[in-house]
């Protein structure tokens, strides 16, 4: 089959926003205007098409990023048809993993902000992730019809809170009840959408007289931003020449692709105004797969040689699995992004991360949770495969003759865990299966069995994250579970360097004995300086320990790191230098050196000023002004460090850093303190030393 849409007319975009900025409604409108969706699904009554899990419809928040394909030829049918693949990303802070995962496979993003609430804490998290993956983006300021809507205020916040360089493409005509349309600052015309056909048609009109001066001022700002794209344009502009509409658009596009500016549009998705022009901006200013750098990877040649794949059908096939979802009718759906080449249903590909072959059974293009079977996918496509056996998020699928491993995604460690048990013994096996499946879908969620208590432990990014996992077990797998009290994922570390710590394991009792002897130094590493949180340096001179036993020493220490001497929590940020020891020709063995290393580690750890580390959360609370004192007092009681506060239209925003162990049940407490009027977000920030009294209590509770 030949390619139907040239790759330059593809746009792989994410729609990303804070909770309640109206992202789901915005996505619905995109699907409506692109002709996919004939009845607009309203999130207010739980009928939105993109939110395809029952819970999302109940909670009114988007959890799973579903991928959808749509086509757009422009508001005035001014373009050839463009194919837009939309990855819907969740806005709740417990689901940042989903956002991170979708950012990885996007070429561009639309950031949706609320015209009243502006740039929220979660918006900042998403912004950082988009920066990390260098995703070009534009902004859509939604809810211009709401009380308190202020477009230019939000433009200001994009500058001050996100440190970005926002350039408005439009101005709002009116606001709140009086919001009627937008001024297009490139064409210098007003756009008036037709209410009778839900905004499918529109008219260009003259800019209202009372807005002429403001429009001229912001038009100048737009032209200046465009002129900065090149010296030629700057000379033309400074020489007093007019820039053509084409020149302005090309220059702005170049600057968006270079991540130098953020173009800002506005509207009200709910009132059918503005989404149409934002779609035009996606085509005019966001990149196609050929506008972004080739994806980097490493060859599977034993030397990890760097390689890249360009967005072309002629290169070998390569794709990245970015999401695994369980579908009640077909089982596993593996969402993947094709970076290069072509693959047909029925083809065999290589999972280069696991060095296993997989057969592409059926390939489907998704529209929210409806699907259409397709025979092939090409560079730039996003689709889902049914029936892949052993693929996890972040795996590379590629041509078996040209193996490559694309960059791995990095997933955060969980910060909270709870014990779960099925309500009936009969459900034990079912629960195991359910949790295994859910863990495969979501790498930030972990499951294990506690060896001492034999309980099943689940761990994730926050209380809501785990609530939803328990909820999904019940809905999708019919397993009801009892849930224990949440536990904090503490860590252990050392604060001092210790030298010449000896570990000796010697047993001579008739026959072959065991002998291992090591001398090590232990020292703290700078937090975050080593991705593994551990380094091992072999400084043995003159063969006092033979080379074959060195890995056993390393392994002996690594095994101890899983359960530290203080309270049995993982040890992090530790460096070990092995520099002396001795061995016995007959009695030495790998096991003896492993045991000697573990003896030295335990001895050294005790002397190296061991500390217990606790997870600290970044907490932001928005509260009515009259409750500020109570909220701050409560955060202080929870050992919170106040980091600042600012006045908002809706009250006061408080920034604090609080230990996770003090935040359990916070939602309920905040509701009662503020009669339900405050809201908060919380995300993991860092690990820090726990105060003595806290550490002691934790150590005693663990029976150490």
Swiss-Prot record:
Pfam families registered for this protein in UniProt: EFG_C, EFG_III, EFG_IV, GTP_EFTU, GTP_EFTU_D2
Entries under SMART domains matching the protein: EFG_C, EFG_IV
GO molecular function list: GTP binding; GTPase activity; guanosine tetraphosphate binding; translation elongation factor activity
InterPro entries xref list: EFG_II (IPR041095), EFG_III (IPR009022), EFG_III/V (IPR035647), EFG_IV (IPR047872), EFG_V (IPR035649), EFG_V-like (IPR000640), EFTu-like_2 (IPR004161), G_TR_CS (IPR031157)
Residue ranges constituting the tr-type G domain according to the UniProt record: 8-290
Organism of this sequence: Salmonella typhimurium (strain LT2 / SGSC1412 / ATCC 700720)
Classification via Gene3D superfamilies: 3.30.230.10, 3.30.70.240, Elongation Factor G (Translational Gtpase), domain 3, P-loop containing nucleotide triphosphate hydrolases, Translation factors
Residue numbers binding GTP: 17-24, 88-92, 142-145
Family: Belongs to the TRAFAC class translation factor GTPase superfamily. Classic translation factor GTPase family. EF-G/EF-2 subfamily.
Keyword field contains Protein transport: no
PROSITE patterns: G_TR_1, G_TR_2
Transmembrane segments: none
Function field: Catalyzes the GTP-dependent ribosomal translocation step during translation elongation. During this step, the ribosome changes from the pre-translocational (PRE) to the post-translocational (POST) state as the newly formed A-site-bound peptidyl-tRNA and P-site-bound deacylated tRNA move to the P and E sites, respectively. Catalyzes the coordinated movement of the two tRNA molecules, the mRNA and conformational changes in the ribosome.
Gene Ontology BP terms: ribosome disassembly
Location within or outside the cell: Cytoplasm
GO CC aspect terms: cytosol
The entry's keywords: Cytoplasm, Elongation factor, GTP-binding, Nucleotide-binding, Protein biosynthesis
Official protein name in the record: Elongation factor G
């Amino acid at each position: 089959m030949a390619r139907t849409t040239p790759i330059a007319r593809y746009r792989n975009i994410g729609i990303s926003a804070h909770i309640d900025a109206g992202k789901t409604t915005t996505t619905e409108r995109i699907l409506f205007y692109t002709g996919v969706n004939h009845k607009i699904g309203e999130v207010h009554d739980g009928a939105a098409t993109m939110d395809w899990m029952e819970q999302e419809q109940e909670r009114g928040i988007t959890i799973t990023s579903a991928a959808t394909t749509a086509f757009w030829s422009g508001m005035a049918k001014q373009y050839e048809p463009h194919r837009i693949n939309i990855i819907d990303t969740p806005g709740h802070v417990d689901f940042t993993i989903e956002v991170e995962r979708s950012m990885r496979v996007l070429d561009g993003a639309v950031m949706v902000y609320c015209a009243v609430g502006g740039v929220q804490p979660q918006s900042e998290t998403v912004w950082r992730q988009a920066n990390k993956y260098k995703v070009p983006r534009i902004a859509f300021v939604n809810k211009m019809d709401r009380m308190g809507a202020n477009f230019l205020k939000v433009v200001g916040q994009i500058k001050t809170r996100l440190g970005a360089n926002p350039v408005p493409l439009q101005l709002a005509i009116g606001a709140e009840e009086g919001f009627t349309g937008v001024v297009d600052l490139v064409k210098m015309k007003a756009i008036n959408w037709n209410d009778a056909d839900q905004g499918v048609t529109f008219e260009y009109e003259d800019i209202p007289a009372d807005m002429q001066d403001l429009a001229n001022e912001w038009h100048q700002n737009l032209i200046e931003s465009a002129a900065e794209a090149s010296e030629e344009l700057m000379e033309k502009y400074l020489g007093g020449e007019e820039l053509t509409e084409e020149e302005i658009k090309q220059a702005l596009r170049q600057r968006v692709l270079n991540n130098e500016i953020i173009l800002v549009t506005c509207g009200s998705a709910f009132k059918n105004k503005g989404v149409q022009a934002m779609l035009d901006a996606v085509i005019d200013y966001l990149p196609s797969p050929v506008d972004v750098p080739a994806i980097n990877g490493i060859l599977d040649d034993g030397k990890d040689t760097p390689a890249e794949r360009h967005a072309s059908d002629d290169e070998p096939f390569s794709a990245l699995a970015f999401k695994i979802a369980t579908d009640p009718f077909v089982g596993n759906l593996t969402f993947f992004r094709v970076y290069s080449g072509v693959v047909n249903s029925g083809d065999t590909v290589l999972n280069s991360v696991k060095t296993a072959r997989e057969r592409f059974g059926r390939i489907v293009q998704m529209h929210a949770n409806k699907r259409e079977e397709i025979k092939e996918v090409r560079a730039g496509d996003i689709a889902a495969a049914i029936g892949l056996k052993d693929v996890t998020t972040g795996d590379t699928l590629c041509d078996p003759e040209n193996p490559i491993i694309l960059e791995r995604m990095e997933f955060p460690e969980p910060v909270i865990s709870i014990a779960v048990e099925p309500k009936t013994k009969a459900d034990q096996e079912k629960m195991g299966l359910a949790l295994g499946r859910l863990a495969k879908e979501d790498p930030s969620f972990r499951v294990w069995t506690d060896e001492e208590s034999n309980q099943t432990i689940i761990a994730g990014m926050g209380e809501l994250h785990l609530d939803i996992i328990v909820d999904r077990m019940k809905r999708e797998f019919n397993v009801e579970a009892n849930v224990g009290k949440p536990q904090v994922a503490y860590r252990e570390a050392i604060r001092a360097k210790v030298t010449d710590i000896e570990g000796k394991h010697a047993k001579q009792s008739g026959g072959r004995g065991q002998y291992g002897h090591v001398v090590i130094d232990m020292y703290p590493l700078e937090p975050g300086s080593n991705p593994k949180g551990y380094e091992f340096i072999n400084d043995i001179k003159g063969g006092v320990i033979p080379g074959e036993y060195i890995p056993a020493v390393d392994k002996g220490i690594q095994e101890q790191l899983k359960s530290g001497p203080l309270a049995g929590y993982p040890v992090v940020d530790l460096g070990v230098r092995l520099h002396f020891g001795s061995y016995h020709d007959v009695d030495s063995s790998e096991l003896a050196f492993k045991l000697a290393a573990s003896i030295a580690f335990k001895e050294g750890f005790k002397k190296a000023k061991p500390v217990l580390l606790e997870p600290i959360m970044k907490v932001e609370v928005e509260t009515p002004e009259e409750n500020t004192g109570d909220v701050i007092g409560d955060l202080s009681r929870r050992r919170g460090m106040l980091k600042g506060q600012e006045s908002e239209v809706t009250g006061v925003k408080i920034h604090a850093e609080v230990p996770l162990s003090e935040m359990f049940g916070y939602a309920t407490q905040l509701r009662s303190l503020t009669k339900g009027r405050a809201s908060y977000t919380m995300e993991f920030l860092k690990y820090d030393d726990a105060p003595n009294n806290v550490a002691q209590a934790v150590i005693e509770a663990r029976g150490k």
